[in-house]
Amino acid sequence: MKRINLTRYLIEEQREHNTIPAELRLLLEVVARACKAISHSVNKGALAGVLGSAGTGNVQGETQQKLDVIANEVLLEANEYGGNLAAMASEEMESFYEIPHRYPKGEYLLLFDPLDGSSNIDVNVSIGTIFSVLHMPKAGEAVTEADFMQPGSKQVAAGYAVYGPQTTLVLTVGNGVHMFTLDREVGSFVLTHRDVKIPVDTKEFAINMSNMRHWAPPVRRYIDECLAGTEGPRGKDFNMRWIASMVADVHRILTRGGIFMYPWDKREPGKAGKLRLMYEANPMAFLVEQAGGAATNGEQRILDIQPEKLHQRVAVVLGSKNEVDRVTQYHLEAKQTP
């Protein structure tokens, strides 16, 4: 069997579809190398003294783990000098990071959640890195936060690396979703799943059931119907899955189908949701749609949302298309009910 590594895949995609110019290819290769370095630190765990809290907080008001800080630094250092980027933005940093003047600047913007699911680090559950690539609107000019304010439909690439039993890089450049597994013996990501597709129907849902009392009625309605099983209106039994790591939950959905929900709840009614639009929802929505699924905030396609700020939050419903459409329909029906 012919082994295709990430570099070869990117070169052949450019030849066939003209979607990956050299600068974007180099950027994606650097991100992949950074993910390899993060994977190495994650795998060492307690042996390298990288578990536990860093004793600091991020802009989200969350306690940073040591590996959060390490992963953020790895991505910044790996990408700042290559000449492919104008700026970067991270879930862990309050403002964007403009490429220092001593380095050449490129035409892309990189956004990332350096270590998603970090509450799972110390208990050895799968975590990951999520990233999104945008064009710099005004190449050659000074970067402002407004340059990042592009809807998810403008992404030129998105992906994640999941650090589990294997380290897997999942990538889209707008021409389907492809998975690459890290071969540690040779140190390269090898194409192992081409053109991944999410089944349109499912019997699995992923949601934090402990928050049920705080949900809006459309979400309660959907979950109640799932829990009713064969005796309820859906006429089939559902299983619940919840890992508390978006990367791990979405990876399962890309692999075998399902629906992932992190809805608005009434504990913080002024916030549209919990997950970050730019670092989590947009790249995952791009991947899910490219795999034949759907992604909404309950009412609107996530990729159509116009961002207003870098750390904007959003409700997320994504996965198997028919289930996402049903949840969206319930939200729209609730709005129309007097």
Swiss-Prot record:
Q: Is Metal-binding a UniProt keyword of this protein? A: yes
Q: Where does Mg(2+) 2 bind?
A: D113, D116, E280
Report keywords, A-Z: Carbohydrate metabolism, Cytoplasm, Hydrolase, Magnesium, Metal-binding
The protein's required cofactor(s) are namely: Mg(2+)
Which Pfam family, any one of them, does this sequence belong to? FBPase_C
Subcellular localization, per the record? Answer: Cytoplasm
Question: What InterPro entries does the record tag this protein with?
Answer: FBPase_C_dom, FBPase_class-1, FBPase_N, FBPtase
Q: What is its EC number?
A: 3.1.3.11
Disulfide cysteine pairs (residue numbers): none
> Where does this protein hold substrate?
D116, G117, S118, S119, N208, K274
The Swiss-Prot or TrEMBL record annotates one GO molecular function as: fructose 1,6-bisphosphate 1-phosphatase activity
- Top-rank taxon of the source lineage equals Bacteria
Report the main location listed first in the record.
cytoplasm
A cellular component term (GO) from this record?
Answer: cytosol
Top-level enzyme category: hydrolase
Note how many cofactor molecules are bound and how: Binds 2 magnesium ions per subunit.
Entry keyword Acyltransferase: no
Q: Which residues of the sequence carry a binding annotation for Mg(2+) 1?
A: E91, D113, L115
What biological processes does GO assign it?
fructose 1,6-bisphosphate metabolic process; fructose 6-phosphate metabolic process; fructose metabolic process; gluconeogenesis; sucrose biosynthetic process
Catalyses:
beta-D-fructose 1,6-bisphosphate + H2O = beta-D-fructose 6-phosphate + phosphate
| Complexes and interactors | Homotetramer.
Family note = Belongs to the FBPase class 1 family.
Name of the protein in its database record: Fructose-1,6-bisphosphatase class 1
Species per Swiss-Prot/TrEMBL record: Ralstonia pickettii (strain 12J)
